[in-house]
Amino acid sequence: MNNRVHQGHLARKRFGQNFLNDQFVIDSIVSAINPQKGQAMVEIGPGLAALTEPVGERLDQLTVIELDRDLAARLQTHPFLGPKLTIYQQDAMTMNFGELAEKMGQPLRVFGNLPYNISTPLMFHLFSYTDAIADMHFMLQKEVVNRLVAGPNSKAYGRLSVMAQYYCQVIPVLEVPPSAFTPPPKVDSAVVRLVPHRTMPYPVKEVRVLSRITTEAFNQRRKTIRNSLGNLFSVEVLTELGVDPAVRAENISVEQYCKMANWLSNNLPSKES
């Protein structure tokens, strides 16, 4: 028997499809999301409706974004969900979540079992819409969740950690074994809750500057900051900002990166930032 077939659908590798089929895990995720009628619930990658059905049961209306044409068609003709669903058959990476929130008249509650092959770029896409999002609950590769929640001085801490924690409060919810899926992925999974900050703990003037600094620092994570960011900050400036020039990218806190970004915004001509 082909273990990539679930409910008559062949999982497509190019879409990173692994279908959730463990009822205990499904119930735990739905409890964590706690969907309520009247909320603007949006699911990314509903697949074979493992989460869509129990969430949809609690709602009058649910919006879903599904790239796979066959799966979108199945949802359209679903016996009890069909009439409740608004289906966008497109790549979530091309979705304007700000426009969607405007259309729905309130901030979005986004959830999904994200395809692991696009989870990191999709997170960055969603971060640019945090003003339009109330919260997010995602099933991700456990290693990605570890990176999202990691603090300084750990191997898992990187650019994703800094940017996620700049935008959101990040809360791990539960771990999920490969056996909960068809076909089983080769990695462990985990569910994470991301709640966008309503008041930024460390406001920055230009997010693109923070993004630039973290990209340059973590692309050369074995180098000290005086070397990896020497083209942007002198040793004196780093010291003035409370950053030891001899440490590496992984030793610098989110707050310190934000201070560095604000200094750079104030001291670089706009065309350079």
Swiss-Prot record:
GO molecular function annotations of the record: 16S rRNA (adenine(1518)-N(6)/adenine(1519)-N(6))-dimethyltransferase activity; RNA binding
GO cellular component: cytosol
Pfam families, per database record: RrnaAD
Cell compartment(s), UniProt: Cytoplasm
Keyword Transferase: yes
Major place of residence: cytoplasm
The entry's keywords: Cytoplasm, Methyltransferase, RNA-binding, rRNA processing, S-adenosyl-L-methionine, Transferase
Top-level lineage group: Bacteria
Gene3D superfamilies: Ribosomal RNA adenine dimethylase-like, domain 2, Vaccinia Virus protein VP39
Residues reported in the UniProt entry to bind S-adenosyl-L-methionine: N18, L20, G45, E66, D91, N113
Function: Specifically dimethylates two adjacent adenosines (A1518 and A1519) in the loop of a conserved hairpin near the 3'-end of 16S rRNA in the 30S particle. May play a critical role in biogenesis of 30S subunits.
HAMAP family tied to this protein: 16SrRNA_methyltr_A
Protein name: Ribosomal RNA small subunit methyltransferase A
